[in-house]
Regions:
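Conserved alpha/beta-domain cores
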Residues: 1-347, 357, 366-370
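Intrinsic low-complexity/disordered segments
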Residues: 361-363
Length: 370
């Protein structure tokens, strides 16, 4: 059982509650607060020099965060997800900005101030999307803004170097979000590995193999997992988004408007965002089978909210996942559920075998005692 932790305090709490690593660190949370202005300058930069300057500031800021989290989890795996949400989430609300512009016009603001505000509003409008969840986010951001995965990888690698020099054992894992095409993970992995080499050359410190993997959160990724696994050291099933995309449910919309009637009318037995749906579980199982067939020894986990649900944990154990990851306060409950699954499941755990002899793995029930 690992934990989802986005800051050093959560990492330390997770460790105290028995987590055996960090299964998800969401780097976008590190861009909020005082740093929001830096990411805004990066997004809205007019020149490559301006963007490069903002990128370096972001990288330096994140290096400190990664250093603290990796230090707190010394010797344990820490899976760091590259930037995932749409960029407009870091910008001012266009409606609020339009209201501000109208007030400026009424109050007689200078022509220069009005021109700058109008230009900003136009840039923000250009970044708005009809369906941001399936738009410019995840790994797609890395192709639209190549500086992003580089600056984040530099920060991870530099933090790792600092800790190694202190005699510690940092174990970062870098996770590429929202992959559905094998070419996406192939190209993004190459970008990440080049950035790691940059830091090795810069510092003279050999970092060894830093695992690079991906989130499986789209149905196509699950059914094409054998191709994706060729370029991924691990899969982490993002069951929140996988549930939305598999069921066609927008969580923000259906939880208040659809699910109450569905639950009351017994159309569905339970909230699929709390306990994993059987169709989503089949996609996870397919991803596990295909991934292990193509890459024996690949690490498989879950980092959605289902990772803290006892019923879902039993399902994931039977499907052969290696770990679940949940919020820090759900770690004790998840550990208990994992122990119960281990003791009562009739399914035999996977046993690592040599790649050359590995067929698609099959789950076999234990033989009844003689």
């Amino acid at each position: 059982v690992r934990a989802n932790a986005d800051n050093p305090a959560d990492a330390r709490l997770s460790l105290e509650l028995g987590a055996e690593g960090i299964g998800l660190t969401r780097t976008e949370h590190m861009f909020l607060g005082a740093r929001k202005s830096i990411i805004q300058r990066f997004i809205l930069a007019d020149t490559s020099d301006e963007r490069a300057c903002a990128a370096e500031e972001l990288s330096q800021a994140q290096e400190g965060d990664f250093y603290e989290i990796l230090s707190a989890m010394d010797g344990l795996p820490v899976t760091i997800r590259l930037l995932d949400p749409p960029l407009h989430e870091f910008l001012d609300n266009p409606r609020d900005l339009a209201v501000r512009l109208a007030k400026m016009e009424c109050e007689g603001a200078s022509a220069d101030e009005l021109a700058r505000t109008r230009a900003l509003l136009a840039r923000i409008d250009a970044l708005s999307e009809a369906n941001p969840m399936l738009g410019l986010r995840g790994c797609r951001l890395g192709f639209a803004f190549p500086e992003l995965p580089v600056l984040q990888t530099h920060a991870i690698a530099r933090a790792t170097v600092r800790l190694k020099r202190e005699g510690k054992n940092p174990r970062p894992h870098i996770m590429v979000p929202l992959v559905c095409l094998n070419a996406e993970i192939r190209e993004m992995r190459a970008i990440v590995e080049r950035a790691i080499i940059d830091v090795e050359v810069e510092t003279g410190v050999r970092l060894g193999e830093i695992p690079v993997g991906t989130m499986i959160e789209l149905p196509r990724a699950a059914v094409m997992a054998d191709r994706i696994a060729r370029h991924a050291d691990f899969f982490s099933f993002g069951t929140n988004d996988l549930t939305q995309t598999a069921l066609g449910f927008s969580r923000d919309d259906v939880e208040g408007k659809v699910l109450p009637a569905y639950l009351e009318g017994n159309i569905i037995p339970r909230n699929p965002f709390e306990t994993v749906d059987e169709g989503v579980a089949k996609l996870v199982g397919m991803g596990c089978e295909l991934g292990r067939a193509a890459r024996p020894g690949i690490s498989l986990g879950v980092c959605g909210e289902h990772g803290g649900d006892p019923g879902s944990i039993r399902t994931f154990y039977d499907l052969g996942l290696d770990y679940v990851s949940c919020s820090p306060y759900r770690v004790p409950q998840a550990r208990l559920a994992a122990a119960q699954a281990t003791l009562t499941s009739k399914v035999r755990p996977y046993v690592p075998v040599t790649p050359a002899r590995t067929p698609a793995r099959e789950r076999q029930p234990y033989a009844e005692p003689v």
